[in-house]
């Protein structure tokens, strides 16, 4: 690809997560693209907007996020968008509805309901762990379960756990908003037209939450570039942030 350094980025997290969950990855990304402007957006019902209701469909989430980006002045030039899981569904909708906004899109560990069956979009092996989150009220226990489910290499990292516990204590995502996001993800069926901008897919072959076959299905449908990490979990930037930024540099520069 052409050299796209000096550009602006928008980053989107996934289900029931907020922008602070990017953690140290932001430092890693900035180190690789030192001249770039990196901007983080919170999905409705998360982060700074935790007291607001989340829509139950990807289209509405997309429109609210775009309004947020416009308000902050992030869209006066096309952006590189980097998104994980649910956030990647929003990114896909964004580039289809507003192609003038997006220069490139990198989508990590995501899935679409019209391309992959439900038992791949949420791996059946994780059902018990996933359901236990719904009945866990203790914040530390809940965040520990999420970390165990989404990370393969840092599942016992007490520093990460403390950070996540603090985030949830300060800006808790409600059970209702979590359900709304689950509904949005479960029902999302993108249009079948080819993406209007360059797209890179990244997935984790050992993702225990979403099957890597889901990214493969997206790759096959539109003949997109897919790069796979052999051992990381669902939270790819947590487990392999250095690998992610290397792929971005190789692809963009």
Show where each model-derived region lies:
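Gly/Ala-rich beta-loop-alpha elbow adjacent to hydrolase catalytic centers
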Residues: 83-87, 91
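Conserved alpha/beta-hydrolase catalytic His-Asp/Glu region
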Residues: 138-192
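Short beta-strand/loop motif that positions the catalytic acidic residue
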Residues: 195, 201-203, 207
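Conserved alpha/beta-hydrolase "acid-adjacent" motif
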Residues: 208-214
